[in-house]
Amino acid sequence: MAAVDSDVVSLPRGRFRCCLCDVTTANRPSLDAHLKGRKHRDLVQLRATRKAQGLRSVFVSGFPRDVGSAQLSEYFQTFGPVANIVMDKDKGVFAIVEMGDISAREAVLSQPKHSLGGHGLRVRPREQKEFQSPASKSPKGVDSSSHQLVQALAEAADVGAQMVKLVELRELSEAERQLRNLVVALMQEVFTEFFPGCVVHPFGSTVNSFDVHGCDLDLFLDMGDMEETEPDPKAPKVPETSSLDSALASSLDPQALACTPASPLDSLSPTSVQESESLDFDTPSSLAPQTPDSALGSDTVTSPQSLPPVSPLQEDRKEGKQGKELELAEEASKDEKEEAAAVLELVGSILRGCVPGVYRVQTVPSARRPVVKFCHRPSGLHGDVSLSNRLALYNSRFLNLCSEMDGRVRPLVYTLRCWAQHNGLSGGGPLLNNYALTLLVIYFLQTRDPPVLPTVAQLTQRAGEGEQVEVDGWDCSFPKDASRLEPSTNVEPLSSLLAQFFSCVSCLDLSGSLLSLREGRPLMVAEGLPSDLWEGLRLGPMNLQDPFDLSHNVAANVTGRVAKRLQSCCGAAASYCRSLQYQQRSSRGRDWGLLPLLQPSSPSSLLSAKLIPLPSAPFPQVIMALVDVLREALGCHIEQGTKRRRSEGARIKDSPLGGVNKRQRLGGQEKSFEEGKEEPQGCAGDHSENEVEEMVIEVRETPQDWALLHSGPPEEELPLMTANCLDKAAEHNPMKPEVAGEGSQGETGKEASHPSSVSWRCALWHQVWQGRRRARRRLQQQTKEEGRGGPTTGAEWLAMEARVTQELKGPNSEQERPPGEPLLSFVASASQAEQTLTVAPLQDSQGLFPGLHHFLQGFIPQALKNLLK
């Protein structure tokens, strides 16, 4: 029980955290269930096993290189049983000897001097290090120091600078790239000895311009028959053998290396050749994480549109001849598979026995693209070698070309990968892999107006002589040099493109269309379409076509739940990008820009996406009633700001922020889709001239603050949004509130317009939503005893709720704004077009927002009904 107590930490609100498994539970029963679960029990057993092994082991050095484990075992058996010996196979300078019991270890250590074959041995206890659970390790590509990331992003000048800084923090350093080049050169040198004329091509994250710290090293071993003869410009030059050996020599302390904790499926420490073969084959998933950047993310099927047509000769063959040739083809295919499997085993044997520093080698012939997985100890890299993945090589070159064509591609992809990872949208299984997410970003950039990137079909047409390539029957032709292509005329800033991406994806028909990068537009999956046109293409909840292998839906593994969650998260992110918190750097030290987007998803953020319905009443009256409910009934402190509008037809370029705080009107676009018209360059959520205004009320926002963002003349500034303004607006036309841009002329001749979306920042110092029913019942009983009836009008109901709030606050809390920080603060946003209210947390250090949001979902609709009746 003591061990369990040391693993469990109590958290606020009755929650618990298991530090061993890196798991947080909501209550004590959930904690008890976790502690009895298989994951926790396995890790407890693994920790005990590692500790026992360490207590039985000794570190041995000083023996000659030609001494093997058998000789060491024979010597140490004189002191007691030997359970295991782990040799340093690379340099042969140390070994870990695990004795059968502690008494045998003590007998070894009690011997003052040890010698073997005339050489003195240095024997000392194995260093004991704190057990590190595999669950507590940082995900690949995530900076271990989150504080450094937060600080760097907070100090950036704007959102675009934050995105560029994120790339700098996550991309490989020059030293890491050189190390990978050395490993590739080492592989090239070794494989050339066995396969003269072969070429080792790196692909995936290493060369597609979207590398991150710790990404896998994916290699394609080309045995020949390449369509293009010139060498890969990204392939490293092979240095001399001596320089390779010295460059890859490990500088790690062997004692520390041997004591480094491993995952539950790893061996004790750096294993010998025999141990790597015997220990690792049971656990194919543990060897090296699959690289999503390669085209191996999901299963592929045969192409519908792009399958080569059946020739007339084949159609005229007789059935008997067809059957005979089918049998011959099956036999030939079987022979080819057996031959490929034999070559794969040969490659694995070469890696095991001939490449210094390589261990945990495993052949995986059953994969869609058969590979040999390996680990390289001196560099710490995981990787795989494939023999038939030339298409992925061109996919990587295509991604690299896209990043070279426009400097905004890399920051946008890095930011969205990080956002998806922190929101649990990318990864293995049913989640989006990085390759699919990158293609989704490229598709989005193809659909801008004007486009940021050309379509694949346009790139194919611009391929020059010598760049026409066909791989596995697919056209992979595109220019190699981005400087030959005309730059995009789209000059939108990164912050605007990021906001547009969220708006675009949240409105896409992911299941009813096929997003085609070759065409740069969605191909509608209409009902009644002949099945033979789609034969081989695996349609699903999300359909994203590979740029070259048109039979491959790179998002075929994504489930309906994940696709729906992707669009939900994009919708919430799009709403956030319309706020000043995204657009402006905080002067009060609060998170701004990218930082809230990159925070892990929480119950608060998920709840903020749930909408609260508003009654179908004139919007100015609804706004006024909402203010009364928040301020009078609940005692919220609402900090006011300025209401502003922009001139009609204002373009994105008029604002340094690209107008991302506007809400778009998409009626015209939706109509065009209903009529069956193509919208090849458009995407729902894009900026257009037909936009409606959004009014935002921000904390302590002054006209001077707005002048920094607004390019219009000062006389466009409108008065504060107060109850008097709302009263006048309602009196002006109580039954038909006007949308911005549709105003009428008042007595002064100036246009009177009403916003279509209003936001408030609210702060609470007391938990006025808890115990409210009990307090109301008590006050109603007092009113009844005094001979007064219950509330019959909206004003009486509001007065009663204000008394309930005061009762919950206590007798000594009559100040509108008490001193000190509020208990929590939130943003309430009302939308006229959607007739909904969105509530999102701003500051919630105690985790109280979920309870408040649950209360508001039932309280707000009933309160507005009472006030507006």
From Swiss-Prot:
<feature type="binding site">
    <location>
        <position position="552"/>
    </location>
    <ligand>
        <name>UTP</name>
    </ligand>
</feature>
<keyword id="KW-0808">Transferase</keyword>
<feature type="binding site">
    <location>
        <position position="205"/>
    </location>
    <ligand>
        <name>ATP</name>
    </ligand>
</feature>
<dbReference type="GO" id="GO:0017070">
    <property type="term" value="F:U6 snRNA binding"/>
</dbReference>
<dbReference type="GO" id="GO:0019899">
    <property type="term" value="F:enzyme binding"/>
</dbReference>
<dbReference type="GO" id="GO:1990817">
    <property type="term" value="F:poly(A) RNA polymerase activity"/>
</dbReference>
<dbReference type="Pfam" id="PF00076">
    <property type="entry name" value="RRM_1"/>
</dbReference>
<feature type="region of interest" description="Disordered">
    <location>
        <begin position="259"/>
        <end position="335"/>
    </location>
</feature>
<feature type="compositionally biased region" description="Basic and acidic residues">
    <location>
        <begin position="314"/>
        <end position="335"/>
    </location>
</feature>
<keyword id="KW-0862">Zinc</keyword>
<feature type="compositionally biased region" description="Polar residues">
    <location>
        <begin position="283"/>
        <end position="299"/>
    </location>
</feature>
<feature type="region of interest" description="Disordered">
    <location>
        <begin position="775"/>
        <end position="796"/>
    </location>
</feature>
<feature type="modified residue" description="Phosphoserine">
    <location>
        <position position="688"/>
    </location>
</feature>
<feature type="domain" description="RRM">
    <location>
        <begin position="56"/>
        <end position="128"/>
    </location>
</feature>
<feature type="binding site">
    <location>
        <position position="218"/>
    </location>
    <ligand>
        <name>UTP</name>
    </ligand>
</feature>
<dbReference type="GO" id="GO:0016607">
    <property type="term" value="C:nuclear speck"/>
</dbReference>
<dbReference type="InterPro" id="IPR043519">
    <property type="entry name" value="NT_sf"/>
</dbReference>
<feature type="binding site">
    <location>
        <position position="216"/>
    </location>
    <ligand>
        <name>Mg(2+)</name>
    </ligand>
</feature>
<comment type="function">
    <text>Poly(A) polymerase that creates the 3'-poly(A) tail of specific pre-mRNAs. Localizes to nuclear speckles together with PIP5K1A and mediates polyadenylation of a select set of mRNAs, such as HMOX1. In addition to polyadenylation, it is also required for the 3'-end cleavage of pre-mRNAs: binds to the 3'UTR of targeted pre-mRNAs and promotes the recruitment and assembly of the CPSF complex on the 3'UTR of pre-mRNAs. In addition to adenylyltransferase activity, also has uridylyltransferase activity.</text>
</comment>
<keyword id="KW-0694">RNA-binding</keyword>
<feature type="domain" description="PAP-associated">
    <location>
        <begin position="494"/>
        <end position="552"/>
    </location>
</feature>
<dbReference type="GO" id="GO:0050265">
    <property type="term" value="F:RNA uridylyltransferase activity"/>
</dbReference>
<keyword id="KW-0597">Phosphoprotein</keyword>
<feature type="compositionally biased region" description="Basic and acidic residues">
    <location>
        <begin position="671"/>
        <end position="689"/>
    </location>
</feature>
<keyword id="KW-0547">Nucleotide-binding</keyword>
<dbReference type="InterPro" id="IPR013087">
    <property type="entry name" value="Znf_C2H2_type"/>
</dbReference>
<keyword id="KW-0548">Nucleotidyltransferase</keyword>
<dbReference type="InterPro" id="IPR003604">
    <property type="entry name" value="Matrin/U1-like-C_Znf_C2H2"/>
</dbReference>
<dbReference type="GO" id="GO:0005847">
    <property type="term" value="C:mRNA cleavage and polyadenylation specificity factor complex"/>
</dbReference>
<dbReference type="Pfam" id="PF22600">
    <property type="entry name" value="MTPAP-like_central"/>
</dbReference>
<keyword id="KW-0464">Manganese</keyword>
<feature type="binding site">
    <location>
        <position position="417"/>
    </location>
    <ligand>
        <name>UTP</name>
    </ligand>
</feature>
<dbReference type="InterPro" id="IPR012677">
    <property type="entry name" value="Nucleotide-bd_a/b_plait_sf"/>
</dbReference>
<keyword id="KW-0479">Metal-binding</keyword>
<dbReference type="GO" id="GO:0051252">
    <property type="term" value="P:regulation of RNA metabolic process"/>
</dbReference>
<feature type="zinc finger region" description="Matrin-type">
    <location>
        <begin position="16"/>
        <end position="46"/>
    </location>
</feature>
<feature type="binding site">
    <location>
        <position position="435"/>
    </location>
    <ligand>
        <name>UTP</name>
    </ligand>
</feature>
<comment type="subunit">
    <text>Associates with the cleavage and polyadenylation specificity factor (CPSF) complex. Interacts with CPSF1 and CPSF3; the interaction is direct. Interacts with PIP5K1A.</text>
</comment>
<dbReference type="GO" id="GO:0180010">
    <property type="term" value="P:co-transcriptional mRNA 3'-end processing, cleavage and polyadenylation pathway"/>
</dbReference>
<dbReference type="GO" id="GO:0016180">
    <property type="term" value="P:snRNA processing"/>
</dbReference>
<dbReference type="InterPro" id="IPR036236">
    <property type="entry name" value="Znf_C2H2_sf"/>
</dbReference>
<dbReference type="InterPro" id="IPR054708">
    <property type="entry name" value="MTPAP-like_central"/>
</dbReference>
